[in-house]
């Protein structure tokens, strides 16, 4: 078993699920169990400054060259999604995959099928790592952690490979949008970085959604239903009117690529008051602004119909498209693309239909595009990762480091 796979299997066995309701950093103490292990392993690899700071793990592999090679960072996150259990993960190896259904769990008759996930057919003959159907796998982002750690281990075992300063960080709470909150950019020390938090092999991303959340509060008036005529105002029904007036063709289930959306992801309410929880996503700044304006204008329209004060919308920006911060330093994307091509991986440059620590970090002065881990179907029981993709990720990391060293040797 290759070292990246061995590391990955050890890391996924540690429960690191984050918790959006918590106000601590990290949001869950169990993330520190992995943090302490990674700190210890970095020190064993010779990164003597390895440390845990505010729940973040940092370490630096000093340059072994006197040339002016830029300091490169590699970042992955320790937490797994709150959307599905990460407790007692039992990873399963499926060797020489034959293209048929994979029985994840005989007891519950849970099957990973190419009928549902046709991308499985791309990996016939390969070894896959799956769940046992009762938890997520945690390739998001423990695969990234394992790949970075394996690359660092390779460099320390091969001092003849010339490199500049390599900075490593593992963050908590990325899955709940707080992964960059306490990130020490200055202390990290990199000139630029890469998150290793992407999906299938070849993914290379430097654009992401502009993101906001919207809370729509709808006020009603409750009276006894037996005496309610011309008196009751049912906030649930008013809320439904707001919902259906937003474009039904602009939801996550009906959009792809560079298309934006409105996503209603929670409703809580009764006759007296109903609250709608939306997220708003778009790549273009003008389209993003129009979406926010649409939600505000719709509330005004509903208030004109039902009376002032029944509808109130509060919109909070969450993160921005990092493209504007990456474009001035596109060499970091070009190097990653060349690294992939050199090791036999076809680059798949695509926008991130989501967020990433790299977006926030880019606006904090650390340009940070995103590299693939190799995983599929994150945040659920059908998550899987081909082992060869993890091995290729390690090769890409090492090749990026090598290309920068070569460039500054001339």
From Swiss-Prot:
As to how many cofactors bind and how, the note says: Binds 2 Zn(2+) ions per subunit.
Keywords, alphabetical: Aminopeptidase, Cytoplasm, Hydrolase, Metal-binding, Metalloprotease, Protease, Zinc
Q: Which PROSITE patterns match?
A: ARGE_DAPE_CPG2_1, ARGE_DAPE_CPG2_2
The reply to whether Phosphoprotein figures as a keyword in the UniProt entry is no
UniProt similarity note: Belongs to the peptidase M20B family.
- Describe the function of this protein: Cleaves the N-terminal amino acid of tripeptides.
Q: What is this protein called?
A: Peptidase T
Q: Which organism is it from?
A: Desulfitobacterium hafniense (strain Y51)
